[in-house]
Amino acid sequence: MKIQLVAVGTRMPDWVTTGFKEYQRRFPRDMALELVEIPAGKRGKNADIARILHKEGEQMLAAIPKGNHIVSLDLPGKTWTTPQLATQLSRWQLDGRDVSLLIGGPEGLAPSCKQAASQSWCLSALTLPHPLVRVVVAESLYRAWSVNTNHPYHRE
């Protein structure tokens, strides 16, 4: 199974790239983690945010291969504990499809992305900087994988 993280924003700080790649490399070949970056629309004083969100949404959805299971990362989504995420990861594997996780920009996800998603995951009730979300998602998925494989990374 491949997990595709589709995120708005490019040119992240070095610590984000380093952190994400650290967890990305730990996954086995049969559980690949891929990052697809979508350029953020230009925001300014008079920016049309609805138009920017729409364009970002179109680009995100175009980056997702047909047949992928789509999960939006969104505040109204479900929160999962590590064991619950591990169970979810197992379900995704049994489903036989690759998974695309969507991370929006500063204003969140386009309505089209929310509608395309069959699940919505709330990473935290806290407001997190979008670059940090990439690292937290990668670590959380790795931890869930380690629970499922009895790897010593996760400790109760």
From Swiss-Prot:
Belongs to the RNA methyltransferase RlmH family. It catalyses: pseudouridine(1915) in 23S rRNA + S-adenosyl-L-methionine = N(3)-methylpseudouridine(1915) in 23S rRNA + S-adenosyl-L-homocysteine + H(+). Keywords: Cytoplasm, Methyltransferase, rRNA processing, S-adenosyl-L-methionine, Transferase. S-adenosyl-L-methionine binds at residues 73, 104, 123-128. Specifically methylates the pseudouridine at position 1915 (m3Psi1915) in 23S rRNA. InterPro entries: Alpha/beta_knot_MTases (IPR029028), RlmH-like (IPR003742), tRNA_m1G_MTases_N (IPR029026). Homodimer. It comes from Shewanella woodyi (strain ATCC 51908 / MS32). It is an enzyme of class 2 (transferase). Its EC number is 2.1.1.177. One of its GO terms (molecular function) is rRNA (pseudouridine-N3-)-methyltransferase activity. Its main location: cytoplasm. Signal peptide: none annotated. The gene is rlmH. It holds the Pfam family SPOUT_MTase. The keyword RNA-binding does not apply. This is Ribosomal RNA large subunit methyltransferase H. The keyword Methyltransferase applies. GO terms for cellular component: cytoplasm. It is found in: Cytoplasm.
